[in-house]
Curated annotation (Swiss-Prot):
UniProt name for this protein: Acyl carrier protein 4, chloroplastic
Transit peptide: 1-55
Localization terms from the record: Plastid, Chloroplast
Gene Ontology molecular function: any one: acyl carrier activity
RNA-binding listed as a keyword: no
InterPro entries noted in UniProt: ACP (IPR003231), ACP-like_sf (IPR036736), ACP_chloroplastic (IPR044813), PKS_PP-bd (IPR020806), PP-bd_ACP (IPR009081), Ppantetheine_attach_site (IPR006162)
SMART domains: PKS_PP (SM00823)
Family, per entry: Belongs to the acyl carrier protein (ACP) family.
Reported function: Carrier of the growing fatty acid chain in fatty acid biosynthesis.
HAMAP family referenced in this protein's UniProt entry, alphabetically: Acyl_carrier (MF_01217)
Length: 139
């Protein structure tokens, strides 16, 4: 269990994350938070949901997934698709999502289990899963 003295601070360091939506912080290197004896800093967004940090997938994997999603959904080239893009917000229904997963399987030479496929909601989710499966496969 960690403890902190009054006036101490915690420093969180991170490598660059994959591309994020405009207005979001990317390439975060460190964050310092003041800590007192009676309270511990909270990493919450203004909406009250916990902040989500996902840096597993390489930026090039996220970019490739973005291209595949655009192609499968027949989106214009200038459409904004990034790691935070939800398939549903891009107009994808469940059949479109299955087709996206099939396109990803073909492109990356992987096999996605049905249970894993159902958990994919965003481009980042797909890219993270691909990296995980590629790592298991030994690529």
């Amino acid at each position: 269990m960690a403890s902190a003295a009054a006036g101490a601070s915690i420093c969180i360091k991170s490598a660059s994350c994959s591309p994020l939506a405009p207005g979001r912080i990317s390439s975060l290197r460190s964050v310092s938070l003041p800590v007192s004896r009676k309270s511990f800093p909270s990493l919450r967004s203004s909406k009250g949901s916990f902040a989500r940090v996902s840096c597993q997938a390489k930026p090039e994997t996220v970019a490739k997934v973005c291209r595949i999603v655009k192609k499968q959904l027949a989106l214009p080239d200038d459409s904004e698709v990034n790691g935070l893009s939800k398939f549903s917000a891009l107009g994808a229904d469940s059949l479109d999502t299955v087709e996206i997963v099939m396109g990803l399987e073909e492109e990356f030479g992987i096999s996605v289990e049905e249970e894993s496929a159902q958990s994919i909601q965003t481009v980042q989710d797909a890219a993270d899963l691909i990296e995980k499966l590629m790592e298991k496969k030994g690529h």
